[in-house]
């Protein structure tokens, strides 16, 4: 039996949306955000993916938001033949009965469909029920009276424009960056670091995001956003920011930066 705890349930409407149902009395959503695992690539880091699950278990986190490129383009040379890459993903992606993944599929993930007619969205929904796909390129997660957008690659999301989501997580960039579009459309955009060894900048490195999202009467209250990097078989925080949403409709969102250490190396010490 598969039991997701605490009350983490979902249903799937017709469009690129899912509803993440929280208890009426639960005012905090804790989740980990990852992106760009590129499974099947020579630069995959399955060890870090396993460490991510262990981190979630140790912290009592039951939700992972995945911003896409879960596999590497099957046209690229890799650890396994292109026709076996989807099976390789199914056999090697971790599983824990208390963890549910919400995934938007990226530009690499569409390659099996183009080459072999393998729709990764259908395959994952049928054979890996803990990996809930919410569409290609962009998807929306409704939670209480709000919504979170997952996007891959970076685009000004039409879903965000329609739903007026205040939070968008982007894959594809392979580095961590916070993008404030508050003066125009008033939402927080976060580029999620990769969970592999494929980098686009010399200052980037693998990592995950730990988020704690607080609600007040069903609406976003504040977001505690932590950037973590791998070290000693786990993850350590290197950056933490808090964003307040209470007056987002009448005032610019307030940011409180707690600590921003400069991390130049992955070496201990």
Language-model features: where?
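Active-site glycine-centered loops adjacent to acidic/histidine catalytic or metal-binding residues
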Residues: 36, 68-69, 106, 152, ...
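Residue-level marker for buried hydrophobic side chains located in beta-strands
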Residues: 31-33, 63-66, 103, 149, ...
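Conserved beta-sheet core of the metallophosphoesterase superfamily
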Residues: 147-149, 154-246, 265
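Core catalytic region of metal-dependent phosphoesterases/phosphodiesterases
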Residues: 17-21, 39-133
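Acidic, histidine-bearing metal-coordination/catalytic regions of metal-dependent phosphoesterases
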Residues: 1-35, 268
């Amino acid at each position: 039996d598969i039991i997701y705890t605490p009350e983490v349930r979902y249903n799937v409407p017709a469009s690129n949306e899912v509803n993440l149902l929280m208890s009426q009395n639960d005012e905090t959503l804790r989740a980990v955000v990852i992106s760009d695992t590129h499974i099947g690539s020579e630069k995959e880091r399955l060890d870090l993916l396993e460490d991510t699950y262990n981190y979630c278990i140790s912290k009592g986190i039951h939700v992972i938001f995945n911003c896409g490129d879960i596999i590497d383009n099957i046209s690229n040379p890799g650890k396994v033949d292109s026709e076996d890459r989807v099976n390789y993903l199914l056999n090697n992606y971790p599983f824990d009965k208390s963890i549910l993944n919400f995934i938007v599929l990226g530009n690499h993930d569409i390659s099996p469909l183009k080459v072999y007619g393998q729709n990764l969205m259908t395959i994952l929904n049928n054979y890996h029920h803990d990996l809930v796909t919410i569409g290609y390129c962009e998807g929306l997660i409704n939670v209480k009276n709000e919504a979170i957008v997952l996007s891959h690659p970076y685009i000004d999301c039409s879903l965000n424009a329609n739903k007026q989501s205040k939070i968008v997580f982007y894959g594809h960039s392979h580095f961590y960056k916070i993008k404030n579009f508050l003066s125009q459309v008033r939402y927080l955009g976060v580029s999620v670091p990769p969970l592999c060894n494929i980098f686009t900048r010399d200052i980037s490195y693998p990592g995950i995001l730990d988020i704690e999202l607080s609600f007040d009467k069903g609406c976003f209250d504040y977001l505690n956003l932590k950037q973590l990097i791998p070290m000693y078989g786990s993850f350590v925080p290197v950056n933490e920011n808090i964003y307040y949403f209470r007056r987002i409709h009448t005032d610019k969102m307030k940011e409180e930066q707690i600590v921003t250490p400069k991390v130049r190396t992955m070496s201990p010490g």
